[in-house]
A protein has these predicted regions:
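Class I S-adenosyl-L-methionine
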Residues: 2-14, 18, 22-48, 59-211
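Alpha-helix-centered segments that form part of catalytic cores
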Residues: 49-55
């Protein structure tokens, strides 16, 4: 990011490693994520999230973008200013079920983005909201609908969007569907390849539908 000019992007929406050693909770020899129900049978490529980004990353992110939304912002409070804009993704988990799924996830938003907001969308193991069923191959994957909700609320047509940790590519698909300019980065070659394949399938299907 150091090569980018100030405010090169209108909005950065990022999901960096939280430093909670997610991969340490999985079966190291085949990447099977531990947990209850169907999620325990899902195979993921193992990645290392034990090292979260430091203060330099967040300083640069805020320099190159006019506004930011940072998933896991509750883990990075020491690096971020106070804000009223907390986005809560309510996964609508059942209260009477014992599982290892979080009921919600938090994202820090730049103070100028307004008050706290809640997005409700089922995302619990193999149970998903919406009319489609998204393929899942990344342990911290988020639904396309979540990113569409964010972009519809906080971005405008013509805005430039940045995602520094592309992961499964859900943000890219959402930006593509909404006609937003988008730049995404992914260091892990396995996830980069899977994301590219996922995006190619999605864009081809969308073009066939339009044609």
């Amino acid at each position: 990011m150091r090569t980018l000019p100030d405010k090169a992007f209108d909005l950065a929406v990022v999901d960096p490693p939280y430093g909670i050693n997610f991969s340490g909770k999985s079966d190291k020899h085949d990447g099977i994520v531990g947990g209850a129900g169907a999620a325990s049978n899902r195979h993921y490529h193992i990645f290392d999230d034990s090292k979260p980004p430091g203060s330099d990353y967040f300083s640069e992110l805020r320099r190159v973008s006019a506004a930011q939304i940072i998933f896991g912002g509750n883990y990075f409070a020491d690096f971020l200013p106070p804000t009223a804009c907390w986005l809560v993704w309510d996964k609508r988990c059942h209260d009477n079920m014992r599982n290892n799924f979080a009921d919600c996830e938090l994202a820090w938003g730049s103070p100028q983005l307004g008050p706290a907001r809640v997005f409700r969308f089922v995302w619990m193991g193999m149970i998903q909201g919406g009319s489609g069923r998204e393929e899942r191959f990344h342990p911290t994957q988020k639904p396309v609908e979540l990113y569409k909700w964010i972009f519809n609320r906080f971005a405008e047509l013509g805005d430039k969007i940045l995602d520094t940790h592309l992961g499964s590519g859900s943000s890219r698909i959402a930006a593509y569907d909404l006609g937003l300019d988008f730049v995404g980065c992914e260091l892990d070659p396995v996830y980069y390849k899977l994301e590219e394949e996922r995006f190619a399938r999605h864009s081809q299907q969308l073009n066939l539908f339009i044609d």
